[in-house]
């Protein structure tokens, strides 16, 4: 149970920390986001921050929920169109877990080629990848600190955990989560809660991963409801971002469980939001485990 913890992502947190993005990246930047984040005004803010530092930035803003291999392929083609074979020096993911997963997948394909299915369950061969700066606008997936990307197989519809590099840096700015609709915030929080529970009880947990699972649970227990009831409570929103990252680190160093496995078909076949699906399955899994010790 005692194994060294692996934390591959440097965390920058605090209100207004989005402005630190221009101090982190340099050279050619490729920004990956979605239409909702554009509409919320976050993309314009970040582009202005880059422009003030004369940082070249091209944008891809067509990420969809529950991204597929085709989504990553389209993003990779946009990167090629923007910067040619030289590629980008940094990929910046601004959005929820879908945007971050597409960015990680795009970085992998740009360096190693192929399709996402080629990296199902394992890391790509040693090729230098463009680093990813993850800037989550939801507090839930933990993708900002994980090396695997959750991508849908175009042929089977199954979710694939595809190996790659974890983001080099993640910015946790609670200002960015205020634009979340209440339903999105609730589903994201349920995802973090499920991550904390499942990583705490998995058979492959370690002492270190259990520490992060417990920290995530502590933060969720104290801040989930306040973050929903008082959307402008930036302390609660910041705590939920930290909870998401802590649970993500626990996942990276252990495993998830049946609630996530059972949720994936719901998202694939019924287009249910990931956090909602996990939240619906978790009580049944907890009850089953309690009755079958």
Show which residues each predicted segment covers.
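Glycine/serine-rich anion-binding loops at beta->alpha junctions
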Residues: 88-106, 137-143, 271-272
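Short Gly/Thr/Asp-enriched flexible loops that form oxyanion-binding sites at enzyme active sites
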Residues: 46, 74-76, 99-112, 145-146
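Active-site segments that bind and position negatively charged phosphate/pyrophosphate groups
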Residues: 199-293
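Structural motif
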Residues: 10, 29-30, 58, 89-92, ...
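ATP/NTP phosphate-donor binding region
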Residues: 1-90
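A glycine/threonine-rich phosphate-anchoring loop and its flanking beta-alpha core
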Residues: 9, 111-207, 292
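Short glycine/serine/threonine-rich phosphate/pyrophosphate-binding segments
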Residues: 15, 39-42, 69, 98-104, ...
